Amino acid sequence: MFAAFDTRTGKVYGMTAARKRQAEFIAFLEQLDREIPATVQTVHVVLDNLRMHKGKQVQAWLAKHPRFVFHHPPVHCSWMNQVEQWFSILQRKRLRIADFADKTALAERLHAFITEWNQVAHPFNWSTKSVAKVMAKCKRTGDPPEENQPVAA
């Protein structure tokens, strides 16, 4: 599944695909380009560090679509990408019991959850209290955050 989380509204855009290659990722980007209003001049896309996101075909697509700007957070910082938080909610609410007859049933359940979510969509709210908790944990475990890296939770 490919998914994008609109940090302003909490709306989720999603697409299921049998494989995760550059071609499918570009198809998802095309979907985003169609569904996100043209009045949104810049679409910031936070991506994990999969090779697929940096491939030649994707880079060629990106060059032709200048309103899309890719951002790759540091390794091991997936929590900085808010769609990962949404995936966690999806996992707990719909995928805990994997009782799917087939891939089609799984895709239907995923799309149904996106529809339900978008009816009550809301942005995630990070707070400075979360930063304090992260820093306290780092102090307790002796594992300081990497230098020059943002700290959030």
Walk through the language-model features, giving the residues of each.
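Short functional hotspots at interaction and active-site rims
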Residues: 1-153
